[in-house]
Amino acid sequence: MKVKICGITHPDDAREAAKAGADYIGMIFAKDSRRCVSEEKAKYIVEAIQEGNSEPVGVFPEHSVEEILAITETTGITSIQLSGEDILFKFSHLREHFSIFYVVSVYSNGQPSAALPPMNDAVTVVYDHIGGERGSPFDWKAFSPFQHNNWMLGGGVNLWNIKEGISLLNPRGIDVSSGVECPGILRKDIFLMQALINSAKELSSSTL
């Protein structure tokens, strides 16, 4: 079970997430996000996890290929998360350079908002609740993932519902942001991160 801790805004949080066993550390570059980081801050975050096994992921919802290449070169980011328009064009120009995550937005009723573009299992699909930052899950019982083996469950996963999500859907990984945050300050709670990552790893072992 892979775990991505997303919306990291501080190097100390990244370091603690990596120590707790997070596989991926996500940094958001969307200017309209409260969790948006600058290139300078992202570089410090990447440096904070260099000695561990966590992989830095840049979240680029509407950036051009040129912008993504420039930011990743400056920061040292090695994986990217994409969404938005011109996705096939971006795949074709970026897949040789990066591991890629692709976001599929899901309505509250569990229905994906759009069909899945053509892609192979090297791309990790992340299912996220439309509205993104509300911190509540979509209807997992009504949800069926596309025929794509490599996918993560996102959008409202937390320590109190992770067991239900994994037992219902058996994802390859989980993507968590607000579910491990300290209230009101956009910093991660070290103990929540540790507990959630441990739960994810233990639950995935029990479902094998």
From Swiss-Prot:
GN (gene name): trpF
Q: Which EC number(s) does the record attach to this protein?
A: 5.3.1.24
PANTHER family in the record: N-(5'-PHOSPHORIBOSYL)ANTHRANILATE ISOMERASE
The family database entries (Pfam families) matched by this protein are listed as: PRAI (PF00697)
Protein name, entry field: N-(5'-phosphoribosyl)anthranilate isomerase
Looking at its record, which EC class is this enzyme?
Answer: isomerase
Disulfide bond entries? none
Q: Which InterPro entries match?
A: Aldolase_TIM, PRAI_dom, RibuloseP-bd_barrel, TrpF_fam
Q: Which reaction does it catalyse?
A: N-(5-phospho-beta-D-ribosyl)anthranilate = 1-(2-carboxyphenylamino)-1-deoxy-D-ribulose 5-phosphate
Pathway assignment reads: Amino-acid biosynthesis; L-tryptophan biosynthesis; L-tryptophan from chorismate: step 3/5
Query: Which is one GO molecular function term here?
Result: phosphoribosylanthranilate isomerase activity
| Family the UniProt entry places it in | Belongs to the TrpF family.
- Alphabetically list the UniProt keywords: Amino-acid biosynthesis, Aromatic amino acid biosynthesis, Isomerase, Tryptophan biosynthesis
Entry's Gene Ontology BP terms: L-tryptophan biosynthetic process
Keyword set includes Isomerase: yes
SUPFAM superfamilies reported for this sequence: Ribulose-phoshate binding barrel
